[in-house]
Amino acid sequence: MDEIVKNIREGTHVLLPFYETLPELNLSLGKSPLPSLEYGANYFLQISRVNDLNRMPTDMLKLFTHDIMLPESDLDKVYEILKINSVKYYGRSTKADAVVADLSARNKLFKRERDAIKSNNHLTENNLYISDYKMLTFDVFRPLFDFVNEKYCIIKLPTLFGRGVIDTMRIYCSLFKNVRLLKCVSDSWLKDSAIMVASDVCKKNLDLFMSHVKSVTKSSSWKDVNSVQFSILNDPVDTEFINKFLEFSNRVYEALYYVHSLLYSSMTSDSKSIENKHQRRLVKLLL
């Protein structure tokens, strides 16, 4: 428990290994790989609590998270730490210290207003911006279309779950020699978003990757039609890399399970009020 609290209050990170050789690429747009246990068993424990929250009416979610949904300022914090003075979003600037893509639903918890759902058997979709592997779209590679000679490539990932995000990180670990994942204090600890910071580009591998992508998409520039789910590797990445990734993501999901459990206990408290011991513990933890 002490380690969970420490990660929430101080953040957590991991440095991923560099691979000189790209894995065999086979880009297919339109569908994500399905989840499986080898890509994170903790998710399947954590998703049970997410489903409990997903059943709650959104007006109640807003009430109980109003004071703990602080503005997500993790990207700004990363810019400050790395002394990044200018960033390039989707080609909007010709010269910058970093090229950036934010795939997260910044400062949002749910997708649409909704009443309560009776039981998990009646859940037909994940209405929360939490643990949704379908949120990872091919936009995660969009900065590479705009990358010239920037020092950093920075991605705000919408989730850490699923094969898609691990395959993506494995590719980035051949495109850049330094790839780090961060879950900052100033990110939302209600959601499984995180930041990837990559630097020291491997030009040879980047050229090979972009050649494959452009041949599949039949375009040398980014097209919005590519903003869809995708798969990119036929074969699973090696177990060593998966375990290194899970070393980071498990810390995040353990923390989320604790936070979500407190929130659910607060929302279902006998007091029938936001003034209860679970909410007080939650506020103390996150503020």
UniProtKB/Swiss-Prot annotation:
Keywords: mRNA capping, mRNA processing, Transcription, Transcription regulation, Transcription termination, Virion. It comes from Vaccinia virus (strain Copenhagen). InterPro entries: Poxvirus_mRNA-cap_ssu, Poxvirus_mRNA-cap_ssu_sf. It is found in: Virion. Regulatory subunit of the mRNA cap enzyme which stabilizes the catalytic subunit and enhances its methyltransferase activity through an allosteric mechanism. Heterodimeric mRNA capping enzyme catalyzes the linkage of a N7-methyl-guanosine moiety to the first transcribed nucleotide (cap 0 structure), whereas the methyltransferase OPG102 is responsible for a second methylation at the 2'-O position of the ribose (cap 1 structure). Also involved in early viral gene transcription termination and intermediate viral gene transcription initiation. It comes from the Viruses. GO terms for molecular function: mRNA 5'-cap (guanine-N7-)-methyltransferase activity. One of its GO terms (cellular component) is virion component. Interacts with the catalytic subunit OPG113. Its main location: virion. One of its GO terms (biological process) is DNA-templated transcription termination. Pfam families: Pox_mRNA-cap (PF03341). The gene is OPG124. Belongs to the orthopoxvirus mRNA-capping enzyme regulatory subunit family. This is mRNA-capping enzyme regulatory subunit OPG124. Disulfide bonds: none annotated.
